[in-house]
Design a protein with these regions (language model features):
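Short functional linear segments
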Residues: 1-48, 55-68, 73-75, 109-117
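C-terminal helical cap/extension that packs against the catalytic core
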Residues: 203-212, 216-222, 311-314, 320, ...
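Nucleotide phosphate-binding/pyrophosphate-handling subdomain across enzymes
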Residues: 136, 141-146, 153-164, 168-172, ...
Length: 432
């Protein structure tokens, strides 16, 4: 019998041993047992290699600005586990989390006696989110972020009002495939019959796959750069400025408080989705509320300044495309700085390419590791590097202390990156 929050979390985390098991049969079985809570939800579904979390955040802030109560389901968490299921940006309470576990545990145990096998950790958390938003907290809208891929992701049992595929890049190839087409096909698996799809995917081969799936499902397709366009882009001192042209109107002088051209693209996708829903009378929102919403958006761990002396930025880039976005943001806003990098990543990432890219901008690069089952050893990363000013320490707190001791000049800055799991630990430590 689970009675405390700690027991509830332990029970959830114990599901980790079941790994990642693509497929929706277990989800469908459990949802049927719980009387289909997902059917009570006005959902927006977000997939893609990078930018999902930021896109979810832009959507939430716009809808909140219009007075709506908005649920979000995201992963991984940055500060507390509960933030994976949030309402208006606030994680649900420990009591609510415990009650959800008490409710789903018997269903999960019954599932184990079927030929479908055991539910994974991610499946259990997804079921809890459906239950919470479907029956326990009457929110107006819920934005669901996929965990991995799309077609067989446990969130893909939802029937959304609109779907978004942020972009297509190389990540989780062991599960999603090695080519752009294979990865795009997995992401395009979220496209539902007659549900519009909005995408920032750029590769011709990826767009071909998405277009084919959209045609098959009779889903209207809106492609960034075609049906809606970013114009008049300009980097600002503390953000980005741009104009967005959509089929439903032009938004001039849009401003973001988040840095990087990739954030302009994420915001454009979110604005396009809200424009579509407004046009179809699925929600009521003014252009001013949309503009204000995206301007107010912040997303922890995404190019976030956590210290001023020395200037220290943490960024959750965890694959080659994420590192590319990080580097272009640094070149755009901090090109005259000496950048001291601290890097750690997971075993299943293309670390060699990430290290090579980072070396092009680094005054120094320090490799470290962190307490996580799939974290890569600092020594392995160090061996990949050919940088003339490289260093390693398996303990990340020591690595940070070492770099901060060195970064004392006016132009020195520290950038910590490589994994969302890593920067979530670092963030808590640096903001203490």
């Amino acid at each position: 019998m689970i009675t405390t929050y700690e027991e509830a979390l332990d029970w959830i985390h114990n599901r980790l041993r079941f790994g990642i098991k693509p497929g929706l049969e277990r989800m469908e079985w459990m949802l049927e047992q719980l009387d289909f809570p997902q059917q009570n939800i006005n959902a927006i579904h977000v997939a893609g290699t990078n930018g999902k979390g930021s896109t979810v955040s832009y959507l939430r802030n716009m809808l909140e600005e219009a007075g709506y109560k908005v649920g979000t389901f995201t992963s991984p968490y940055i500060e507390t586990f509960n933030e994976r299921i949030s309402v208006n940006g606030q994680p649900i309470s420990n009591e609510a989390m415990t009650a959800l576990v008490q409710e789903v545990k018997p269903v999960v145990e019954r599932l184990e006696h079927t030929n479908l096998g055991s539910a994974t950790e991610f499946e259990v958390i997804t079921i809890m989110a459906f239950l919470y938003f479907g029956y326990h907290d009457s929110v107006d809208y819920v934005v669901f972020e996929t965990g991995l891929g799309g077609r067989y992701d446990s969130t893909n049992v939802v029937n959304p009002m609109v779907s978004i595929i942020t972009n297509i890049g190389f990540d989780h190839m062991a599960i999603l495939g090695d080519t752009v087409e294979e990865i795009a096909a997995e992401k395009a698996g979220i496209i539902k019959k007659e549900v519009p799809i909005i995408t920032g995917a750029e590769q011709v081969k990826a767009l071909d796959v998405i277009t084919e799936e959209a045609n098959l499902k009779q889903a209207s397709l809106f492609v960034l750069g075609k049906e809606f366009k970013i114009e008049n882009y300009e980097p600002l001192a503390n953000g980005e400025g741009f104009t967005l042209k959509t089929p439903y109107g032009i938004f001039e002088h849009l401003q973001l408080n988040m840095l990087g051209y990739h954030q302009v693209k994420n915001a454009a996708l979110a604005v396009m989705a809200v424009c579509y829903l407004k046009e179809k009378k699925k929600l009521s929102i003014s252009n001013e509320q949309m503009i204000k919403g995206i301007q107010h958006t912040k997303w922890n761990g995404r190019f976030e300044i956590v210290n001023e002396h020395p200037l220290t930025i943490i960024d959750g880039a965890h694959n080659a495309e994420g590192i590319d976005s990080l580097l272009s943001t640094l070149r755009l806003h901090y090109e005259d700085r000496n950048i001291h990098l601290i890097f750690s990543c997971l075993n299943d990432k293309s670390a060699d390419r990430m290290v090579q890219e980072l070396e092009t901008i680094a005054a120094s690069i320090t490799f470290t590791s962190f307490d996580f089952p799939r974290a890569r050893a600092a020594g392995e990363l160090y061996e990949m590097s050919t940088h003339r000013n490289k260093h390693m320490d398996e303990e990340w707190k020591k690595a940070i202390a070492y770099v901060k001791e060195k970064a004392t000049g006016e132009q020195d800055m520290v950038v910590i990156t490589g994994s969302l799991y890593f920067i979530s630990e670092v963030r808590a430590f640096l903001l203490k």
